Every structure is written in structure tokens, then in C-alpha cells.
């Protein structure tokens, strides 16, 4: 039996199937109890509808002309498709007589259609711009019918092969999406209809509640190839999801939470993308188009594909709004530049790195022209807003961090407007950070702020010497910052050469100490003394120090050395032995003062002095003991008879029989919060206190090379004796303990220099319990 191609009306096939069923029933009802029981390669539900039967199959092969409608690769599959009608009562010929030629034609067409619907994953999608015909069959450029299948690109979904009712609520849409996504995850190839969620309603849906956790994980499962065009995601939460090759055209994503959401290879044209302010991490767009899409001013567009803008009008939003073009994207601007708008739109340093400045700048360099144009439009808006200096002041740093860099420096309009802003920013930096350390520079600061400061010093060379504290910090961080570019380092080195040539600086560098010892810098090693800070009070005074020393003094740790520098007067090195570090920093180099004082407050040695020498009874002596801790060497000596007698009177009650009295020992434990501490912890503290009193008795503080106050030596030895009783294990050996004890008292011919004892004990403590030593020993003695 043959039928022509003209016999098939694709648009009426569903009705033809209904008529066919009626026809079969009419032809078989008078004693002919036959039913169709098997249709090869067709859906089970269709078999069930026609299921009957006994034997004597009659087969109808699909006509060759219908087969020829399809590509050659599909013929083998179609050849296998046979319609078998079993056990029609009466003879085969009688059965044939009851089925008309017209009905056979209808059966062929209907079953062919059903076969196609269930074999779609076996066909290649060959649509070349042709609109789909009803039922998923289309006509290609050569007018040959083709079949849509599961690999249909998301931007051109074909119509559903079977009419299905759309979900009626967001919950139903969510259930349908969950089912499709899980089938895709299981490896099933979805048809275009399966992935068609156009006009869907996902409002208020939290996707983490309907999808497995694997879809929210880093490098987890992906929602791939779905069509969400013209859908609603308002107030939904799509955080941490990855949409790949998806279509969102004309969709609404207002107030959607999309923290760390990834859109890749997707079509997001004509979308309202004003995501919720509760979005913590910005969404990312990788090889994604956003033509005429409205974007919030706090987006990262580093992977967006820009195209030429069309003549479309700005989008309409509730409450109105101003907009600027960024390529073919729309960026929202404030209606008025109020104080809140300035902070919200421009201050990324206050808003977790998010601002309209960073949004525009996030585009790749290949879009430089579009970036500059958008920034110029932004500057015009700011200029039109007539903002005061006070209003701009909080965002000066954010503005220069972006606009003072290429490609925006190429714009005369931007340069003219930014010039005064950058000058005010630089003046504020000089005022703020000349006498205090700069914040530890992170990547942002190294790449965006340090180059601006270099440029400002280059324009204002006098500031190099008038604000030597800030200038040296900037050079330090440029030379040591791991995220600084080679260009930044080269410019910093060149500027420092200009600084060294200044008449206020050059006298201090030709003394055989600076840099590589010949008056020039040596940036090959951080140990070279390359930095020279000028006194803030006396132009004849300077401090020379290395990169490592400058870094540690600006950001100290408990074991930082505060005397590892050269103090220069008229270019000559002078001793710091008689100089109090705190006074030196307060008067000449205040950039170190705050850090020094902060470390000093963590040293608790003074608490023991207050126990022994109360300010009420021994005010003058208390001040002498405290003042001595602020310098390496003291000019005050306590070896005269009156001083020795007074000290003996004070310390005798604390040392009955040469040992710590139980009451005084408990006072010490209480003062240092050691009452419940382990014996070893108590011993370590007493050992370090002994070290400090050994220093008091030495020639460096209250003693001389030939004499020292006996009461101080005896008290130091008593502290050490108690530490030995508590925990001998903290000592190097019993022999060393005995040696130190003999030196305190001059027994057995031991050399009685307590400076040697103090240094030896201090080295041991620094090696084995440094944190305890650092919490007690005065900074000037460390």
C-alpha cells in the first residue's frame, strides 16, 4: 500500500488518530472482536489504547515516500517500524476489507508521528532558521522536514511535541523544574520541550530548598540549556546556582537574591536585573549578553559580552530613575546625588568593594572605549549635581582609585574634573599618615592607591621631605608589596633617588652606612639600610634603617627590636644608649610612637614595681624605677650609702632568710593572674622577673662596673630560687642555675657582673619561653 506525501496533513494528525479509533471500532463491532495489540517502536500508552488479540498478524510497512522525507541515517530505524494488527476475526482478507485505504493511510501517518515523538533523541537537530511546524516537525532550507530533539540550542527552543498544561503556581513550576533538572543530572537527554520554562513563575521560590545541595556547591551540578524567557523570578533566591547556555530574555529578576550565582554562555537580553540588596556576593556573567538589560550599580561585569547599543529608550522602573549606557547595557543612576546616593553609588571602600565605579571598571580592557564613555557620563552627572567638597570628601579615595588610572586618564573631561579631587585626597593622606602607620596594604591598596600616591608625590616633590614619614611608607610598600607591579616598583625607586638628592637628605647618606655603602640605594636585599626618615622637628636629625626593620617597627610583634637603626645628626651616627625610645619617637619620629606605646602597654613588669614601691610611700623611687625601664642606660645610680640603706629597708621584709616571703609570693601570683596556673607557668614568670631585676642591678641601670645595689641583686636571686623550686625543668641545667646564683652573690670566686647574668638569662628565656618574656621585660631592655 502506498500513499503520497500530499496525503499527510501534519496539523490534523491528532484528530486523524481519533477518527481512526472510531473507524476501527465501527468495522469490528459485529462479531469482529479484534483489537490492535502491538505497535512496534511506539509508546506503551499507545499500545494500551489498541491492545487486543489472537493471531494472524497483518503488517503495514511505512510507505517509502514518507521515509524519503528524512535524512538517510534515519532510514534503518524507520524501516523497523511496522504496524501489526493481530487476530482480526474472519480471514486476513476480511480484515483488510473492513479497513479502508483511507484509514490505512491515516494509520500510517499517525503511527509514524508517534514513532517520531519517541525517537527524537536519535535524530540530529537540523533546523536552519525555519519556524517549527505543528507537532515539532519543521522544514529546513532545502524544504525537507526535520525533527527537533533534545540538543536544541536554548536560544531557539522548538515547540512541545505533545500538548501539556502549564503549571498553575510557582510551587508547581518549581516541581516541574526540579523534575527536569534531576532527569538531566541522571544523564537523560531532555527534549527542547522538557527544557522549555518560558513564561514560568518562580516568584518567592528559594531554589536551595527544591534542588539537591550539589547544585549549590562550588564546581557542582549545572542547570544547562533551559529556556526561562519571559519568566518571573521576583523575590526568589537563586544563590550559588550555575546557569549555562540558558535563556532569560524579557525575564524579571527584581529583588532576586543571587549571591555568587553564575551565568555562563547565556542570553540575558532585555532583562530587569535589579537583584536584592541582601545579595552578599555579586553574581558573575561569563560570555553572557545583557543587551538592553537594566543592571544595578553594584555588579561585576568582567565576563559580559558587549555589543553596539540600539536606539531603545531607557527602561521604565517604579519611582523613575536616571540611566547611563555601558555599551548596550543600562546602568541605573540616582535621581539626585544626595549624601546617601554618593555613598551608595560611589563608595566601594565602604560597601564591600561595590560601586558604579567598580561595575564599569570590571569590564575587560577590550571595552575601553565603552568604559570611558560611561565614566564621562557619570562625571557629567556628578558635575551637574553641584556637589560640595564636604560631600565628595568621603568618596575621594574611591574616585581616585579608579579614575586616576588608565584608560580614564586619557579623557580630558575626566582629568579636569578629577584634578582637584586628587589634590584634596593627597593632602588628607599627608595629614593623616605622616605620623601614624598606613594600614597594612591589601591587594586593592597596592594596585589602586599606592600608584596614585606616587603620582601625587611626583607632582608635589616638596612633600617628600615635609612629609617624610608618609613618603617613606609609600616607597616601602611599593617595593615590598607582592601585588605591586614592576612598573610601580620602578617608579618608586626613581622617586626615591630624587628624594635622596634633596639638600635636606643628601648630607645623611655619604657616611659609609647607607644602602650599598656608597650613598646609593641597594634594593637587591631587604637588609640594606635604604630608608632615611627626617625628623619632624629638627632637619639636622634623621633615622637610617633597613626595609625589614622599618616594616617591623611599623607593624611590631612582641619580640620587635626598637633600637635596630642608626640615629644621625648632621650625617654622623650617634649613640642611642642614653636616649629614651619613647621620647625619641614622640619628638622626632612620631610615626612609630603609637605602635611602640601599644606594645609597651602589653609589658606588665611595672605591676611588680607598684607592689614593692607603692606611690603613696615611695613615690619618687617608684618614678625612678619606672623611668629606668624607658631607656637602655640610666644616668641615675643607687649605690651611695643612703640609697643602699633605703633599698635594704624596703626589700628586707620581702626576703626573710633571703627567700621570698609567702605573703609576697602570693601578691606576685595575684598581680600576674597565676594563682591557678601550673608550677611551670609560675616558674617562667618568676624567672623573667628575676631577669629584669638583674638588669636593674647592673651597670646599665642602677649599678656601676664595680658596684651594684645589694638589695636588687638579692631580690633577683630570690625570684630565681623560687622559680627553681617550682620547676627545675625550665633551667638549662642545675650547673647553670648554680653559676647564676653564685654570680648574684659573688660566691666561690664567681664573676659578679650582673649585666652578664641578665643577658644570659634573657637569652635563655627568649629561646624557651619568649611569650612570657615579651609580656614582662620592658621594651627598651628587649
From Swiss-Prot:
Record Pfam families: SopA (PF13981), SopA_C (PF13979)
Catalytic activity: S-ubiquitinyl-[E2 ubiquitin-conjugating enzyme]-L-cysteine + [acceptor protein]-L-lysine = [E2 ubiquitin-conjugating enzyme]-L-cysteine + N(6)-ubiquitinyl-[acceptor protein]-L-lysine
Main localization category: secreted
Domain of life: Bacteria
Keywords per UniProt: Secreted, Transferase, Ubl conjugation, Ubl conjugation pathway, Virulence
Biological process (GO), any one: protein ubiquitination
Enzyme type, top EC level: transferase
Record's compositionally biased regions (Low complexity): 157-171
Name of this chain's protein: E3 ubiquitin-protein ligase SopA
Species of the source: Salmonella dublin (strain CT_02021853)
Underlying gene: sopA
